[in-house]
From Swiss-Prot:
It is found in: Cytoplasm. PROSITE patterns: G_TR_1 (PS00301), G_TR_2 (PS51722). Its main location: cytoplasm. It comes from the Bacteria. The lineage of its organism: Bacteria, Pseudomonadati, Pseudomonadota, Gammaproteobacteria, Pasteurellales. It comes from Haemophilus influenzae (strain PittEE). GO terms for molecular function: GTP binding; GTPase activity; guanosine tetraphosphate binding; translation elongation factor activity. The gene is fusA. Keywords: Cytoplasm, Elongation factor, GTP-binding, Nucleotide-binding, Protein biosynthesis. One of its GO terms (cellular component) is cytoplasm. GO terms for biological process: ribosome disassembly. This is Elongation factor G.
């Protein structure tokens, strides 16, 4: 079957934003204008097509990024048909893993900002993730119809808060309730959308007289940015010649793709204005799969390989999301980087070295699906019924194996114990948690060896609330939840040398003998977390026992001597020891190493580390005193404040253990008018009194 849309006309984009910037509404309008959904779903009444899990509809926030395929030929049908795969990414900080994962599979992104709230804390997190994956992006300033909307203020914040080279592509005509449309600065025409047909049709009009001077100035700014794309254009521009519309657009596209500029559009998705022109900008300025560098991977022989966006190359794809569908079981969303795959084909999961058969392949529209026979380079689709695939796995041609980089997921910072209410719940709970952990790598499940309790860990209170909620709804498991526990860490502050560990047992017949001498030293927190250096000279310990020493120490790292928390940021140097021809064994050296480690750890000034969160509170000015006072009681370090006439943004670093229940307290202090976001920042040494209390509590 031949390709229906040339790959140059694909756009794989993410729509990314802070909570409540109106991202889901924006995505809904995209689906509406591209003709996919006929009734616009409103988030206010919990009926948006993209938010397909029940909790999302209740909480009005987006949790799972659904991938949707839509088609667009331009506002005035000026382009051949383009295929836009929209990946809806969550805006809540507890779900940053989902955002990271979708960033991997996007080629470009639309960053949605609220014209009133501007660049909010979460926007910065998402921005940094987009930088990390070098995703070209454009901005859409939404909610231009709201009181307090100010387009140019948001453009300014993009520059000052995100360091973006933000360049308006449009200016709004009017603002707040007088917002009527936008001026296209390249054409120098005002665009007026027809309210009667929900913005499906529009007219070009002259630029309002009172805006002429401003528009000229901003157009100059835009043309200058285009001219900077090449010396040739710069000469033409400086020589006083006009650049053609075509020259301006292709130069701007080149600079967006190189991540040198961010073009800014605006509108009000809710009022059906501006999304249509933003879609045109997606087609004109964001990359096709062929515009981005080949994806890198690792060949079976550990050399670096790559795959280009071409149907001719061997098949390679990345599984970026696994969702459980009530009707068909597991849906594995995957992005094809190269080659072609047909339903019924068998591929290799190169990470697990297992074969998988692609039974049915579907393309999703929010939560409706359409079966398709094949997918090609650049496509995003979902496979039904793959057996053993986890997010981040590579699915590729059996005869051309490659591992596309594994994604690294952050370590969870918060844990709670869950206990099934009945015996029947117990069996179902194991299954449910296993399923949920497979979908979400930032969520972990383990059994506490001492208490036998099931412990779940995640990225924040909201994250775990939602996991428990899904367990109840999707798997019908009733469970009691314990108090949230903080994931502390242990480390050392000073170096100790020549610490001995000897394991010798002589009990008739063959004995056990292992003897090691190690140094223990602190490592930089930014470093690898653990290193093992073997400096045994002259075979005082035979080579085959060295890995056992390393293993013995690594087993101790899982549960540290202070309070049983994981041990981080230390190095071990093994430099002396002895062995016995008959009695030595791997086990004996493992035990000797663990004895040496415990002895060395207690001498090396061990300390407890606690997770510190980066907390940003936005509050009306009248509550600043109360909010800061309360943060100080929580051992916060307030780093600064930033104010405009509506809100004060407070930047602080607060230990996670002090943040439980903060949402409720903040609501009552500010009558529900403040909001906050937090994300893991670093681990820092816990004060002596806190450490003592934690260690004491662990002994009970």
């Amino acid at each position: 079957m031949a390709r229906t849309t040339p790959i140059e006309r694909y756009r794989n984009i993410g729509i990314s934003a802070h909570i409540d910037a109106g991202k889901t509404t924006t995505t809904e309008r995209i689906l509406f204008y591209t003709g996919v959904s006929h009734k616009i779903g409103e988030v206010h009444d919990g009926a948006a097509t993209m938010d397909w899990m029940e909790q999302e509809q209740e909480r009005g926030i987006t949790i799972t990024s659904a991938a949707t395929t839509a088609f667009w030929s331009g506002m005035s049908q000026q382009f051949p048909q383009h295929r836009i795969n929209v990946i809806d990414t969550p805006g809540h900080v507890d779900f940053t893993v989902e955002v990271e994962r979708s960033m991997r599979v996007l080629d470009g992104a639309v960053m949605v900002y609220c014209a009133v709230g501007g660049v909010q804390p979460q926007s910065e997190t998402v921005w940094r993730q987009a930088n990390k994956y070098e995703v070209p992006r454009i901005a859409f300033v939404n909610k231009m119809d709201r009181t307090g909307a100010n387009f140019l203020r948001v453009v300014e914040q993009l520059k000052t808060r995100l360091g973006a080279n933000a360049i308006p592509l449009q200016l709004p005509v009017g603002a707040e309730e007088n917002f009527t449309g936008v001026v296209d600065l390249i054409k120098m025409k005002a665009i007026n959308w027809n309210e009667a047909d929900q913005g499906m049709t529009f007219t070009y009009e002259e630029v309002p007289a009172n805006m002429q001077a401003d528009c000229e100035e901003w157009r100059q700014n835009l043309v200058e940015a285009a001219a900077e794309a090449s010396e040739e254009l710069m000469e033409k521009y400086l020589g006083g010649e006009d650049l053609t519309e075509e020259e301006i657009k292709s130069a701007l596209r080149q600079r967006v793709l190189a991540n040198e500029i961010i073009l800014v559009t605006c509108g009000s998705a809710f009022k059906n204005k501006g999304v249509q022109a933003m879609l045109d900008a997606v087609v004109e300025y964001l990359p096709a799969p062929t515009d981005i560098p080949a994806i890198k991977g690792i060949n079976p022989d550990e050399t670096e390989g790559e795959r280009h966006a071409s149907d001719e190359e061997p098949f390679s794809s990345l599984a970026f999301k696994i969702a459980t569908d009530p009707f068909v079981g597991n849906l594995t969303f995957f992005r094809v980087y190269s080659g072609v795959i047909n339903s019924g084909d068998t591929v290799l999961n190169s990470v697990r070295q297992k074969r998988e058969r692609f039974g049915r392949i579907v393309q999703m529209h929010a939560n409706k699906r359409e079966e398709i026979k094949e997918v090609r380079a650049g496509d995003i689709a979902a496979a039904i019924g793959l057996k053993d695939v986890t997010t981040g796995d590579t699915l590729c041609a059996i005869d051309a194996p490659i591992i596309l980089e594994r994604m690294e997921f952050p370590e969870p910072v918060i844990s709670v114990a869950v206990e099934p209410k009945t015996k029947a719940d117990q069996e179902k709970m194991g299954l449910a948690l296993g399923r949920l952990a497979q979908e979400d790598p930032s969520f972990r499940v383990h059994t506490d060896e001492e208490s036998g309790e099931t412990i779940i860990s995640g990225m924040g209170e909201l994250h775990l609330d939602i996991i428990v909620d899904r367990m109840k709804r999707e798997f019908k498991v009733e469970a009691n939840i314990g108090k949230p526990q903080v994931s502390y860490r242990e480390t050392i502050r000073t170096r100790v040398n020549d610490v001995e560990g000897k394991h010798a047992k002589q009990s008739g017949g063959r004995g056990q003998y292992g003897h090691v001498v190690i140094d223990l030293y602190p490592l930089d927190p930014e470093g690898p977390g653990y290193e093992f250096v073997n400096e045994i000279k002259g075979g005082v310990i035979p080579g085959e026992y060295i890995p056992a020493v390393d293993k013995g120490i690594q087993e101790q790292l899982k549960s540290g001597p202070l309070a049983g928390y994981p041990v981080v940021d230390l190095g071990v140097r093994l430099h002396f020891g002895s062995y016995h021809d008959v009695d030595s064994s791997e086990l004996a050296f493992k035990l000797a190493a663990s004895l040496a480690f415990k002895a060395a750890f207690s001498k090396a000034n061990p300390v407890l580390l606690e997770p510190i969160m980066k907390v940003e509170v936005e509050t009306p000015p009248e509550y600043v005193g109360d909010v800061i006072g309360d943060l100080s009681r929580r051992r916060a370090m307030v780093n600064g404040q930033e104010a405009n006439e509506f809100v004060v943004k407070i930047d602080a670093e607060v230990p996670l253990s002090e943040m439980f229940g903060y949402a409720t307290d903040l609501r009552s202090q500010t009558q529900g008018r403040a909001s906050y976001s937090m994300e893991p920042l670093k681990y820092a040494e816990a004060p002596t009194s806190v450490a003592a209390a934690v260690i004491e509590a662990r002994k009970k």
